[in-house]
Regions:
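Disulfide-stabilized, aromatic/cysteine-rich ligand-recognition loop
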Residues: 15-16, 21, 118, 179-181, ...
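Mature N-terminal segment immediately following signal peptide/propeptide cleavage
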Residues: 32-43
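Short Gly/Pro-enriched turn/cap motifs at secondary-structure boundaries
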Residues: 27, 52, 174-177, 241-245
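Short, well-ordered junction/capping motifs at the entry into regular secondary structure
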Residues: 160-189
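Active-site microenvironments of metalloenzymes and redox enzymes
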Residues: 56-157, 255-259, 264-268
Length: 268
């Protein structure tokens, strides 16, 4: 785990390369919205098993908050089905409904969606793309860490801006209920860890969660999935969609700018 100051020194943000202004996305057929912030391009140095690796990051947008249950429920339960169908919607996969909703005891409205598998997170991003006509994705590790470092936080900042073991009372909290980081993103560190496509080709979770100490959180914090994340799943084979014991794991969407703005289209 690299100290925040060393991490910040590895970042070379390029001015004038933002993808555009911030905007609010709305899911057709619903009242659900979420805000996207532009992230400038740059380069970021990541720690890998083979040593440091510098990755160039093109400009993109990132969601201001972690995905909430309010939005994820629309995807899971099809609350958008009354809206006009979009081209490509027949290829959208939706999760099976969980036997017990992960983290159900925490509450629901305004809280981060959690316990979805990496496959489910990617399918969710595809659904948002089809419904909006814009290309949404689960971030790569380089994109996520680049955005995190732009809002680089000191140890004192993390304690004040993050839901961690010291203040979270072993549960998630409403997104954006803590102050944003210097870049305007909420809960990048803490609350729930966030799925990314790892630089080494594996899926990993970044940023730490409410059950971690604030001192353990940094932009380079990462977790790999273990068997314990779906240990209590009663299904055989176990669900591809849900990790019932990963009540500390969510997702934050990004959008790439070189897409079509025509609704219902989606570039690979």
């Amino acid at each position: 785990m690299l100290p925040l100051m060393l991490a910040a020194s590895a970042l070379r943000a390029q001015s004038g390369t933002t993808p555009g202004a911030k905007y609010v996305e709305k899911i057709p057929g619903t009242l659900i919205t979420f805000e996207m912030l532009p992230v400038p391009g740059g380069s970021v140095t990541l720690e890998t098993a083979a040593g440091p690796r510098t990755v160039q990051v093109a400009p993109f947008w990132m969601a201001r908050t972690e995905t909430t249950w309010d939005l994820y429920d629309v995807y899971v339960y099809g609350f958008d089905r009354s809206a006009p169908r979009m081209p490509g919607e027949e290829a959208v996969s939706r999760p099976t409904r969980p036997y017990v909703l992960p983290g159900d005891a925490f509450g629901h409205d305004g809280l981060p969606a959690l316990g979805m598998s990496f496959q489910a997170a990617n399918a969710f991003a595809h659904w948002v793309s089809v419904r909006t006509g814009r290309t949404y994705r689960v971030p790569t590790e380089a994109q996520w860490e680049h955005a995190c470092r732009l809002g680089a936080q000191s140890t004192a900042d993390i304690a004040a801006r993050s839901w961690a073991r010291e203040n979270a009372e072993q549960r998630t909290h409403e997104v954006a209920s803590k102050p944003a980081d210097a870049f305007g993103l909420h809960d990048v560190l803490g609350n729930v860890a966030e799925w990314v496509a790892g630089v080494d080709g594996d899926s990993v979770a970044k940023g730490g969660a409410y059950n971690m100490a604030a001192s353990e959180m940094s932009c380079s914090s990462r977790m790999r999935q273990t068997a314990a994340w779906n240990e209590t799943d009663p299904q055989l084979p176990k669900s591809r969609w849900w990790l019932p014991d990963a009540t500390f794991l969510g997702v934050r969407l990004i959008r790439v700018p070189d897409d079509s703005t025509a609704r219902g289209t989606r570039r690979p």
